[in-house]
Amino acid sequence: MAFPSVTSVTVENVTFPPTVKPPCSPNTFFLAGAGVRGLQIHHAFVKFTAICIYLQYDALSFLSVKWKTKSTHQLTESDQFFSDIVTGPFEKFMQVTMIKPLTGQQYSEKVAENCVAIWRSLGIYTDSEAEAIDKFLSVFKDLTFPPGSSILFTVSPNGSLTISFSGDETIPEVTSAVIENKLLSEAVLESMIGKNGVSPAAKQSLASRLSHLFKEPGVCDPQSHK
């Protein structure tokens, strides 16, 4: 199922389709937003990855209750809006496609650093989260990601983080690892689109696309997604 306004998004020659079916999920998700992740190095903005976020259709009815009257600008500026996406009771799927080559260690250590920073700021960093971070780092330990390859995350409301890899932009049918830790599963997404998320462009895209979807007739009716 896809709505007319759910279109593909192209980020630096990487095209993310309107809908996908993640590995090991029976559900089809819609493309909620996408954008580049980069860093300002000296006087140049260096783009490292293209990030996209897909959501289960149930997300629309859940999020619209609080946010359907807000403008794109209001959503973009609201930390709570993105927090509701991160913690909402629906599945999420994220794809990170390389623009620049990265090693698994480079990628995973930066994500882990961001996750730990989030937990420490909230005072919720425990031994359980430290163990989950160790598992996360070990999944990426010996991997390399050339341009065009992808890392894929599926976040389940029950607290599992499923990790998959692809040599290109396609969605694999098999998974590489599953880590059972709710805080980690949410923190990986929060590190992308949360208060200090690494991709402001993806946040802007999410706010714009969801703002328009909320206003489409019937889109936020849970019965229309069955």
Curated annotation (Swiss-Prot):
The keyword Iron-sulfur does not apply. It comes from the Eukaryota. Substrate binds at T49, N114, S191. Keywords: Flavonoid biosynthesis, Isomerase. SUPFAM superfamilies: Chalcone isomerase (SSF54626). Mostly expressed in flowers, and, to a lower extent, in roots, shoots, and seeds. Its EC number is 5.5.1.6. The record marks Y107 as: Important for catalytic activity. Pathway: Secondary metabolite biosynthesis; flavonoid biosynthesis. InterPro entries: CFI, Chalcone_isomerase, Chalcone_isomerase_3-sand, Chalcone_isomerase_bundle_sf, Chalcone_isomerase_sf. Pfam families: Chalcone. It catalyses: a chalcone = a flavanone. The keyword DNA-binding does not apply. One of its GO terms (biological process) is flavonoid biosynthetic process. GO terms for molecular function: chalcone isomerase activity. Part of the biosynthetic pathway for all classes of flavonoids, a large class of secondary plant metabolites, many of which are brightly colored. Belongs to the chalcone isomerase family. Catalyzes the intramolecular cyclization of bicyclic chalcones into tricyclic (S)-flavanones. Responsible for the isomerization of 4,2',4',6'-tetrahydroxychalcone (also termed chalcone) into naringenin. This is Chalcone--flavanone isomerase 2-A. The lineage of its organism: Eukaryota, Viridiplantae, Streptophyta, Embryophyta, Tracheophyta. The gene is CHI2-A.
